[in-house]
Amino acid sequence: MRSSSSRQPQMQSYYAIATVWALIIGAATYYFFSNSKPKAVLQRGDTAFKEFPLIQKTVLSHNSAIYRFGLPRPSHVLGLPIGQHVSLSANIGGKEVLRSYTPTSSDLYDKGYFDILIKTYPQGNISKYVSELAIGDTMKVRGPKGNFVYNHGLVESFGMVCGGTGITPMYQILRHIAADPADNTKVNLVYANVNHDDILLKKELDAIAAENDNIKIHYVLNNAPEDWTGSVGFVTKEILEKHCPPPGPNTKLLLCGPPPMISALKKASVELGYEKARPVSKLEDQVFAF
């Protein structure tokens, strides 16, 4: 018969091995769960600005570019619900200036960075400031914010009308719908610009429309080339009626663009039977202006 003293080293060895395995399993479990849901850098309700470095600039035209800002870690996401925007801040001429932008990137598949499409205006404060940033320079960002959040099943169909950089929230929603095989939401987008070269993200938009039967895009130009097949001039009530879905309980009309354009579209939408848009849009509104 073995003595208890002879069994003691065996028991100690057993406990040591069990402890090591417990630590390994615990570490693996922590790693799995900590990496299964990427950490969101921004949280709704945050009042403090966070700084992010510019890591890439992709020029789209003579006055527009996509600016890519890096997040603290490659596994991080910005923390932006679909349809929301962020505020950029900079000290310009001794004053703190803020502007809102909708990132074109998405938490769904863009990790470690976020993209913002900005058109630079001669008298623009933030847009000019960002255009002069060098790689490695930081930008102050706060958010997310906004009254619109897209989730699968929100509506059966969208009418979207935008001008210029007003494409950014529409693109974010379109990209999300196109990435989800189960999302069959119908989208009719009317995108207006002055010149053909002003059409932002056209290659990406055309690719989305070509690969998704539920997404249709119609372009409008003020100054159209001779071989142009889209509409010419401003977005009229007739264009809205022809290329957007009729008003209904499962339809929303989304608007984003210059104030005069939005004002005209709100009036035209009422004439077509849509509910009158409120001064500040809410998610439940039939007509939502970003």
Curated annotation (Swiss-Prot):
EC number(s) recorded for this UniProt protein: 1.6.2.2
GO cellular component, one term: plasma membrane
Name of the protein in its database record: NADH-cytochrome b5 reductase 1
Family annotation (InterPro entries): CBR-like (IPR001834), Cbr1-like_FAD-bd_dom (IPR008333), FAD-bd_FR_type (IPR017927), Flavoprot_Pyr_Nucl_cyt_Rdtase (IPR001709), FNR_nucleotide-bd (IPR039261), OxRdtase_FAD/NAD-bd (IPR001433), Riboflavin_synthase-like_b-brl (IPR017938)
Chief site of localization: mitochondrion
Keyword ATP-binding: no
Span of domain FAD-binding FR-type: 47-151
Transmembrane segments: 13-33
Record-stated family: Belongs to the flavoprotein pyridine nucleotide cytochrome reductase family.
Molecular function in Gene Ontology: cytochrome-b5 reductase activity, acting on NAD(P)H; NADH dehydrogenase activity; transferase activity
Organism expressing this protein natively: Yarrowia lipolytica (strain CLIB 122 / E 150)
Annotated binding of FAD, by residue: 131-146, 157-189
Pathway in which this enzyme or protein is active: Protein modification; peptidyl-diphthamide biosynthesis
Keywords: FAD, Flavoprotein, Membrane, Mitochondrion, Mitochondrion outer membrane, NAD, Oxidoreductase, Transferase, Transmembrane, Transmembrane helix
Names of required cofactors: FAD
